[in-house]
Amino acid sequence: MTDDTRAVVLASGGMDSATAAYEAQTRGYDHLYLLHTSYGQNTEDREYECASALADHVDAADFLHVETGHLTQIGASSLTDDSMEVADADTDSDEIPTSYVPFRNANLLSMAVSYAEANDCGAVFIGAHSEDFSGYPDCRPAFFDAFQGVIDAGTKPDTDIALVAPFVEWSKTDIAERGVELGVPYADTWSCYRDDEPACGTCDACAFRLEAFQRIGERDPIEYAERPTYAE
């Protein structure tokens, strides 16, 4: 029987998923089950540390770390393939970036739904936002709507799991503003695609993050090798 106080949160170690966890708590999900995956990404050790820290911050009911090495074997992403370079930031581009991991969210959500069903959770939270789906096809609202249909068709009759993407129509700036309001510990989050410490400051992930903090007038608490001004 589904328990509407329990939710799985896909915890990447980044600021979006951390904010999603705190948002879930404000919506009455008092028992959070955090799922973190390592798939050979360049900064997987740092991301794991941050996801583990988030589990402590929210007093998670459980923290599950899963190795998904098949995404490294598949390759075709600069996050997992050493033959591909992580490109410098181009926040105005509408092209699919080299950091796109083919159909990653379908893989991660499938595991999250299994985890949710096994623990009678009423929801799965993912921190995708509007600036993600401009470049990543599996972050689009239509994808999440379709995946909700997969959940409904493929789980037990007495299972009722909602796929919640609370920020799918929000910008990164909106998320940063909400997170500051909720007291999200952004010092314990990581976004950089290139480096474990300090963050590079020049990849897409760093650029969107820095721009968000600059737009709300807050200093990003993590260290950067470079800290360019992205907000005009």
UniProtKB/Swiss-Prot annotation:
Residues reported to bind Zn(2+): 192, 200, 203, 206
Main function: Catalyzes the ATP-dependent conversion of 7-carboxy-7-deazaguanine (CDG) to 7-cyano-7-deazaguanine (preQ(0)).
Gene: queC
Transmembrane segments: none
EC identifiers of the protein: 6.3.4.20
Catalysis performed (reactions): 7-carboxy-7-deazaguanine + NH4(+) + ATP = 7-cyano-7-deazaguanine + ADP + phosphate + H2O + H(+)
Family in the record: Belongs to the QueC family.
GO molecular function: ATP binding; ligase activity, forming carbon-nitrogen bonds; zinc ion binding
Keywords from the named record: ATP-binding, Ligase, Metal-binding, Nucleotide-binding, Zinc
InterPro entries noted in UniProt: QueC, Rossmann-like_a/b/a_fold
This protein's name: 7-cyano-7-deazaguanine synthase
